[in-house]
């Protein structure tokens, strides 16, 4: 959605990395796309349907268009230093399905915790799959590394919310990364929309679908689902 003013600089850094192959940029608002030659770079594939296809369909699109054994799903307002890509490139993923970002210690669930002077620490999670992952102080939807073989196509019933939960509930070996080299804010794009916007209406529909269908363990009792299950859209 091009809300991050430094995005083109981020892309330049990623293109310079020997550990980054193809970069698939899903343009959900072509009218706001900045003018930059970086989009002509050989590593970048710019995809635009002329409208906002929303978060989870964009993830699925990236999966379809990629050919790497290891995928990075990354929000435009998150910056990942090259050392992280190097770390992931050298990591044995044999017993790893999915890696997300650590939030523990944050004052809220909207900021990635900075761990200064800390080496990268990979922690295996005993995830409570009966609760949404965001409420457990881990961020997967903003930055995650997942094996191609572990990715599952997210149903079109869920277009903004619950994509990370869908993947997590279908993965066995789930980890989180403590690091000072992934920075940014969470949900910055979502909170920019007013309550009557199509985005907010879509969030309500996602929640209603999570209540109605059986894609998630215990989702009928999730606070987010309860909040919107009877709301008009």
Annotate each language-model stretch with its function.
Residues 49-66:
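Glycine-rich, basic loop-to-helix element that forms the pyrophosphate-binding segment
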Residues 124-146:
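A recurrent flexible, glycine/aromatic-enriched loop bordering the glycosyltransferase active site
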Residues 2-16:
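Short, well-formed alpha-helical segments that are part of the catalytic scaffolds
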Residues 157-233:
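C-terminal catalytic/acceptor-binding lobe
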Residues 68-79:
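Short beta-strand-to-loop acidic/aromatic patch adjacent to the donor-nucleotide binding site
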């Amino acid at each position: 959605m091009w809300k991050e003013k430094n995005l083109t600089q981020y892309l330049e850094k990623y293109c310079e990395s020997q550990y980054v192959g193809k970069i698939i940029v899903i343009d959900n608002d072509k009218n706001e796309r900045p003018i930059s030659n970086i989009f002509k770079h050989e590593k970048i594939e710019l995809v635009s349907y002329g409208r906002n296809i929303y978060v989870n369909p964009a993830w699925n699109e990236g999966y379809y268009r990629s050919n790497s054994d290891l995928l990075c799903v990354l929000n435009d307002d998150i910056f990942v230093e090259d050392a992280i890509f190097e770390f992931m490139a050298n990591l044995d993923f044999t017993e790893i399905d999915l890696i997300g970002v650590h939030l523990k210690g944050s004052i809220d669930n909207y900021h990635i915790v900075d761990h200064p002077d800390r080496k990268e620490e990979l922690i295996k999670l005993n995830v409570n799959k009966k609760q949404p992952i965001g409420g457990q102080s881990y961020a997967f939807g903003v930055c995650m590394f997942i094996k191609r073989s572990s990715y599952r196509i997210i149903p079109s019933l869920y277009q903004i919310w619950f994509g990370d939960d869908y993947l997590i509930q279908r993965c066995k070996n789930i980890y989180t990364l403590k690091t000072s080299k992934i920075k940014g804010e969470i949900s910055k794009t979502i909170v920019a929309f007013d309550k009557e916007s199509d985005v907010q209406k879509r969030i309500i529909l996602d929640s209603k679908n999570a209540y109605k269908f059986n894609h998630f363990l215990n989702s009928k009792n999730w606070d987010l689902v309860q909040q919107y299950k009877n709301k008009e859209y």
